[in-house]
């Protein structure tokens, strides 16, 4: 039970940390390794019940040359993104039941229980704009800061996306960035930018948006770390777009409650003398037979033999390919949905992933407008990465 009809940072963190502690030791950081933990908690305002529904740990991304055209490899394995993708697994499972989703026969879609909300937590400030503390002097805002103990400015390693400067490490507040890293540059946007996107268009993504009546937003964003700054978090997630108009009936920019509690400790938080763990961890609130807990290495499932590395057996349950199959399976075996999508999905084995995403017309229209108004410099991945179908990996 959560007090005051809203879960506190401490209550949310307790659910996340207890679940992490209960998971098998395999895949977790070893001695002198650190990682980031992120989780999503469901809260019912009517019953005041809280439950953890998704957990992710990770710090890695793959470079542009390693992007997979068949949807088998995760591009982005930062904790925030893993937790969100694990959340998608949970939502698909819930659509098979009659607990938080209910069929709306008038709209031919699913409504989510109005008493249910979701709260996000991370043990570290999201990479990108949220890590930058704006300086008082405007002329100095874009000054290059060194990564040393004397720097008074919170530093992000996320790389600036701009045609106006040759220096991708300029600490410019409010700018779009790709993920940090010393290797090949990635096309994955920073976690600050992704959370800002979810704050406008929802966390459900295009495929799930086809099935539900309203986008799903986080009611609160919670951070338990020493370096989190409320001003920077608010700017990164919604304030940097305050001056830009966006008119859409279904999707609206949110102003979620942002909470910080530096007193909560995660045993594997980042330390300067430790190395980042190479593994990603994902847990979802789904039945045991569906394998709720997985370990990722380089965007693939740990333990897969070299012979099967390029097959669907290497794909995590939260990969594009596996979530696509989950979507198609849900539609196929749900009489209401199969009737509704009878024409569009007449040949489900050969329909392209991109074609299914395009079924979410409202979502795609809004996303195009959002990119024009908010995220003009959002990276573009090759379209052929979305052309796979269920038969691509068989």
Curated annotation (Swiss-Prot):
Its cofactor is 1D-myo-inositol hexakisphosphate. Binds 1 myo-inositol hexakisphosphate (IP6) per subunit. 1D-myo-inositol hexakisphosphate binds at residues 84-85, 194, 197, 320, 357, 381. One of its GO terms (molecular function) is double-stranded RNA binding. Zn(2+) binds at residues 78, 127, 191. InterPro entries: A_deamin. It catalyses: adenosine(37) in tRNA(Ala) + H2O + H(+) = inosine(37) in tRNA(Ala) + NH4(+). One of its GO terms (biological process) is RNA processing. Its EC number is 3.5.4.34. Residues 54-388 form the A to I editase domain. Keywords: Hydrolase, Metal-binding, tRNA processing, Zinc. GO terms for cellular component: cytoplasm; nucleolus. Specifically deaminates adenosine-37 to inosine in tRNA-Ala. This is tRNA-specific adenosine deaminase 1. The lineage of its organism: Eukaryota, Metazoa, Ecdysozoa, Arthropoda, Hexapoda.
